[in-house]
Amino acid sequence: MERISSAPSISLGYPPTESSAHLAPSFSDSATSTLSFKSLLEDPVNPIRPVYTPTRTEITPVTLSPIPITPVREFQPYLHEISQEYARYSKQKRASLRRYLEKHGKLEGSMKESSINGSLLRRSSVSTILRPASESSYPNSNSETITYDIDDNVNPSSSLVDNFSISSVPSVFFQSDFNLDDPQIFDVVSEHIDITQTSDAPNSNRNLLLNNSMLQEKISWYLDTVELHLLQEIENASDSFPMIIDNLKQLKKETRDNVEETKHLLEKLTEVNVMCDRHMDAISSEELACHQLTQLKKVVQTLEDIYSEHKKVSEDVKDQRFLEAINGINSIVTQLKKKSTELNVDLLSLPSVKSLREEHKVLYHTVSQSVVQQFSKFLTSDMHKFSTILDSNELKDIYLSKNRLIPSVTKSLPSAMEFDADFLHEVDVCIDCLTLTDSLQAALTLYKTAVFEAFENLAQQYFTDGVEMRSVRKSSDLRRSLSAASLSSLSDSSRRSSSAANPFQSMSITEFAEMLTNIYFSSLECLRRIRSQIKVLIDILSKKDTKQYHLSVILNDLMATSSDVVTQQVTTINNLRFRVLDTYPPNNVIYLFSLHIIFHNELESLCGITQSSFIPTIMRQLLDWFKNFQRYSTQKLASSFERELWEAIPVEPSCQDLANRVFECSGNTPVEWTRLLSPEAEKEDENHRVHHVKVSEDCTATVSFGKQSLHIVRSSVTLLETLDDYGKLLAHFSRLAPEFQTGMLDMFRTLNSRVYQLILGAGTVRSSGLSKVLGKHIALASQTIALFQLSLNSMCRYLSRVTGTRLTNETNKLDQDFTVHHLQIHDKFVSLMRERVAISCSQIASLSWDIDSPHGYIIDLSKSLIKLYKVLHRYSQRDCVEVIPDVIRMFEDRLQLELTDIARNPSKWPGVRIDLSYFYDMMASKCGYAGDRTLLEKFERTPEQQEAA
């Protein structure tokens, strides 16, 4: 295109714009003279370098082809398809514009105040010759169609062509992938597809376009058309440029003023900012100070609360509210940690708090030690309190009745498992305190130690009280020394010193038994309570804290060890007392050792089998005592029978009771043997089983031993008493059965020998002080041997029934010895009467047979026989039945021998018949003899009858 002059020219026949119509004439003239088309293309603000632009006259005129106007309604189907996308785009565009305006609000405000014409602001930066005067409105984002404000019926100018349908536009322009860079689309749009592609060519040949002159010419024409349209557009906007330039100059001036003013404002603003910074720093400092003051107030308030709670903790410790104190200490620590986090202040590092924590440690240790001590004292106190619910006598009666040693009693043992609510609450609180202070193990260990000490003190206290019973009249120094002395030290001192130094020798059996009763039954009650306490503790630990439940194993051996402590104490006491045990009567020994056995059995029931030497020691002591008792009893009986006067004594009811028990024991154990009697006073020399010879209404002449009635002497009563003691001992201590059998046989063997020697031997007169041995002596000896035999058989059957042992050969041999000795006594009676009949019959040779009265010899024989009958009938009816017939037969034999020759003399026969008739009459009348008169019948028969006989 040819370059032409750049002189301004606006005579193109275009109508003037709205802006140029309102400009002042002066401004239009100056603008016309100064502005040119070239200046329109320069930067109106900063024209750094000139830009060459062609003028209108330099452009070759081109006839513009009219651009058809398509009505909006033709675009409605298309717009309807893109309505949603366009609505979203419009919404985003408006939001973006709004943000931009808000961001540059000051700039828009300054522009509104400037002298720029408002019409410039309403004019779009892009316009076409086809754009109508009114602006198109944005579509509503909520509507489905897009509408415009222009009227479809606006008459176009005369330079525009008639409306045509959009359907005449090729469809390629409406494709979604429309892009002129695509060669195929470009070929279709340029309508030269036939040039670039032949029918037999699959791909277009782009080189054909470069050589096609028609296409080149058409493209050139298109470019000219575009250029003209651009020039037209520029021409339409050229009227506003002078005003814009003027406004720009004014704007530049105002801008410089504004810049200066802004500079001053910036300086002031800087000063203000500096002052603001200073004020902000001051405010920050004040705020920091206020914040710190607030924090300080909170810290002080927290510390005040902490110290107030600490004071309450101290009061709780002082008042022994240990659980509240521990919870208070833990609460203080929790509050300190919580407040440290909330206030962002390490309160635990404060010196006052550190000092407070040290005090808490001291209080914590104090609470721990106090709770440990209180826990032990509380349980031991409950143990002692429970053991004193019943006194020692009531406990003794209950335990003896439980073991069937005395009749049943109405009272029963208190339940050891009954705990009141206060006790359970106190134990629960103590365990909580011990768990929180980690001192549960120490508390349980101390509890065990306290229990052991309590049992030691219990035995020691009763021991001291028992000694002081006998020492109450002694000096106070002695009583204090006894109270301070321990059992072990007393035991050692008693071994080194004489027996008189043993304080037990001065104690009566009643006092000693009472002391043992207190120790035994109080200890059993304490152990019963301890077992219940252990169950309660284990239950509480299992429910409360499973982690520390294993500590309950500490209490496993408490019962067994406690029983060992008690048994050691009482073993020491019994060892000390055993030095004088030989003087005890059997009833007292039975009472004491029954207490020992009851105590041991109850211990095994409560604590299981113990390993202590208590029961072996007790049984060894009992066996030693029994051996001494057996020896003493045998010697006493032997001495008694040796000094026996052999006089029948009246039988008192107590003696008959003794005989009944000895006789009945073979079938059933007498109740009196199984019952336990209270200990008696040691007055054996005066009152213990001393029987005076006295006759009362309750006394009988004989003692009934089953179906037999026997006369007894004083020594026989001693024998029955001894057998009664043996029966009691065996009823209570079946372990003594072997020693019992041996001792009893030795005793009967000794007595049998002693009686046999004294009654039948030659030393009777000298040993017993008798002037001569009479028939009653022999009769009572026979009765005594019968008593021996009956007692031996009954006691042996009792032993066999109780122990399950069979009778030994020694027992049978001893029984046979008694039978032999009894027969010897019968022979002794016959022998004595034989001597008597010999003396009497020596007078027969010198007698005169012509008198009518009995002779003196037959009268003497009758008197002797009657006297023997009376003695035997009174003292030994059994011997009377057996001996009198033998004596009569012996008399008949001797008289037959002496009188046979005399009876054959008829002159003497009447005298013989008178003597024999007198003899038989006296036997029948005085002795109750109902037998045949054999001798008289023989002498009355004829010689022939006698020869035949």
UniProtKB/Swiss-Prot annotation:
Transmembrane segments: none annotated. GO terms for molecular function: syntaxin binding. The gene is vps54. The modification Phosphoserine is found at residue 483. Belongs to the VPS54 family. Signal peptide: none annotated. It holds the Pfam family Vps54. GO terms for biological process: Golgi to vacuole transport; intracellular protein transport; retrograde transport, endosome to Golgi. Keywords: Coiled coil, Endosome, Golgi apparatus, Membrane, Phosphoprotein, Protein transport, Transport. This is Vacuolar protein sorting-associated protein 54. Residues 1-25 are annotated as: Disordered. InterPro entries: Vps54, Vps54_C. It comes from Schizosaccharomyces pombe (strain 972 / ATCC 24843).
